[in-house]
Amino acid sequence: MIPVTSFSGKTVAVFGLGGSGLASCHALKAGGAEVIAGDDNADNLAKAAQAGFITADLRTVVWANLAALVLAPGVPLTHPSPHWSVLAARQAGVEVIGDVELFCRERARHAPDAPFIAITGTNGKSTTTALVAHLMREAGYDVQMGGNIGTAILSLEPPRRGRVHVIEMSSYQIDLAPSLDPTVGILLNLSPDHLDRHGTIEHYAQVKERLIAGVQPQGTAVVGVDDHWCAAIADRQEQAGRSVVRVSVKRPLAHGVSVEQDRIVLVSGGARSEIADIGGIGSLRGRHNAQNAACASAGALALGVSRDILQQDLRSFPGLAHRMEQVGRKAHVLFVNDSKGTNADATEKALSSFDEIFWIAGGKPKSGGIASLDAFFPRIRKAYLIGEAAQEFAATLEGKVAYEISGTLEAAVPAAARDAEGAGRAGAVVLLSPACASFDQFRNFEVRGDRFRELVQALPGVTPVV
């Protein structure tokens, strides 16, 4: 745990008592603050009370007595409208911050030179975060990995020399961290997402840019420039005097890092050199993972990791569950769990990675549906549609891709397996990449992916991929 000493002797309200909120309560208390915990959920309030914290309806507190409101990232700050606790804090002149801001203040007070790598982007954050952590760990660092990827940042060990914090950050967390100042900031890509919480793509991009704008003066900003939003951010931040490493998987760069025929190439000062060859690495299959690998490599290089280590340890990266995870094989058929593909942009990355696809898709639909994926329809031999989006997706696929409305994973998995095996096509893949949220049938995308894995591995003749 990281004790938060910057509010010692002061009273702080924490609203939103899930994992990161409760971790904030513990960290603030350990640092000497008095904590008042609030939540709209009675069960969360009860858990906080059982943990020994003062709980209250924050509508009844005297806001003038509070030094700060620490807001959980899941609570609306601006859109669709500010949460009532945010309005109350602002009316009283109380700052509204998040757990990453508390981390940044502690690091600035106690270990400002401790390496801190922050990663964001619409897609690929978790894989890149895990890959950076893997590379740094293999290079001999004491690595603390957390943030949006799972472990709350304040539940990690405190910053110190020789210890690197590798933190995945959502736009919500960035929005609550005005002092964000990573040693290395990585922005992978941007596409419309979470607009219910940001209003417009322009505001969403502005929030993401803050991670790059906050990079320390001697630090490095790594920016994927294959979309126009990020390309513009790279230009602006370079003009502002920051050291920017551009990354592309679509074209060679005159200066920066690119991926050419599975080779990560660095061009700097006119000199061209190969960093690593990622061909044949199953956990880094596909162009999207090439971008993840290139950005992670650029970040590791910025902290002094050698190229020899990069080549060796990119190959030993095991990958992440639910992100192009190979969960089983039966004869010529591969089963791939990409449950994290919760929007069309993410699913595009999966569809672009295979040629003979038996596609399981659907769930709680997102704006835009799957019309943007039509360039990949020729790769799809048949689609198996589940969840609320089934009828909408069927209308999009009509006349272009064979499909059946399976309704559930329990029906879709054996049907897709039967058809893939019967087709006799080399390179056949049963791919779960739903292009949808999971909340219509599952608690989250992890539960959905776990269920897919269970169903696949229960099929006769399937062997796990190791």
From Swiss-Prot:
Positions bound to ATP: G121, T122, N123, G124, K125, S126, T127
Gene3D superfamilies hit by this protein: Mur ligase, C-terminal domain, Mur-like, catalytic domain, NAD(P)-binding Rossmann-like Domain
Keyword Protein biosynthesis in annotation: no
GO cellular component: cytoplasm
Domain of life from the UniProt record: Bacteria
GO biological-process terms attached to the record: cell division; cell wall organization; peptidoglycan biosynthetic process; regulation of cell shape
Localization in the cell: Cytoplasm
Signal in keyword set: no
EC numbers, comma separated: 6.3.2.9
InterPro entries per UniProt: Folylpolyglutamate_synth_CS (IPR018109), Mur-like_cat_sf (IPR036565), Mur_ligase_C (IPR004101), Mur_ligase_C_dom_sf (IPR036615), Mur_ligase_cen (IPR013221), MurD (IPR005762)
Catalytic activity field: UDP-N-acetyl-alpha-D-muramoyl-L-alanine + D-glutamate + ATP = UDP-N-acetyl-alpha-D-muramoyl-L-alanyl-D-glutamate + ADP + phosphate + H(+)
Pathway listed: Cell wall biogenesis; peptidoglycan biosynthesis
Gene Ontology MF term list: ATP binding; tetrahydrofolylpolyglutamate synthase activity; UDP-N-acetylmuramoylalanine-D-glutamate ligase activity
Family: Belongs to the MurCDEF family.
PANTHER family attached to this UniProt entry: UDP-N-ACETYLMURAMOYLALANINE--D-GLUTAMATE LIGASE
Biological role stated in the UniProt entry: Cell wall formation. Catalyzes the addition of glutamate to the nucleotide precursor UDP-N-acetylmuramoyl-L-alanine (UMA).
Name by which UniProt lists this protein: UDP-N-acetylmuramoylalanine--D-glutamate ligase
Organism of origin: Nitrobacter winogradskyi (strain ATCC 25391 / DSM 10237 / CIP 104748 / NCIMB 11846 / Nb-255)
Recorded name of the encoding gene: murD
